[in-house]
Amino acid sequence: FCPVRLQRLSAALQAEVARQRLPGAVALIARRGQTVMFESLGLQDPAKGTPMQAGSIFRVYSMTKPIVSVAAMMLVEQGRLQLADPVAKYLDAFAKQQVGTVVDGTLELHDVPQGATIHDLLRHTAGLTYEFMGSGPIQRRYAQARVAARDGSNAEHSQTLANLPLVAHPGSVFEYSRATDV
């Protein structure tokens, strides 16, 4: 990495903090296991004057999706994960999923003949959804299951998702969802 470019990045972040367009930041750049930049600047909590720290925790919401996707593709490159693998190969709970269809206002559940693959999770075609992606009976089940609360572990969260009905058969429809949470 070029030290001049790293200094420019640092100066740009400091300028954004000085202009109060950014309360604070933690910047980390690493390559091949070597950290070349790691700095904290600005405030973690402007109201309290709490300085940003290297260990500050951020709520990044859907920005985890590209991070998880890159990590998954690194595992694919290493031969430790195959995109065509069924999710059930790694998580048994995904072996017996059901897809929901609404008939005359009633939710009917049907077994899924072929489960979702890793590829389906990454491209949001696994049949999962969000509770706010509509107001139908499937979305209500997601809300009732409190999947947004994230009270449990990742394993518990995945188990909960596996037990909820799918909005579509895996591989058939794009539905922005909690798929990369799995």
Where does each model-flagged region fall?
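Beta-lactamase-like hydrolase cores
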Residues: F1-R31
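Active-site-proximal loop and beta-strand segments within enzyme catalytic domains
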Residues: Q14, P46-Y176
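Residue-level signal for well-ordered, solvent-exposed loop/turn and beta-edge residues enriched
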Residues: Q34-T35, R80
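Amphipathic coiled-coil signal-relay and dimerization helices
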Residues: T35-L41
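Hydrophobic mid-domain F-helix/FG-region of cytochrome P450s
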Residues: A179-V182
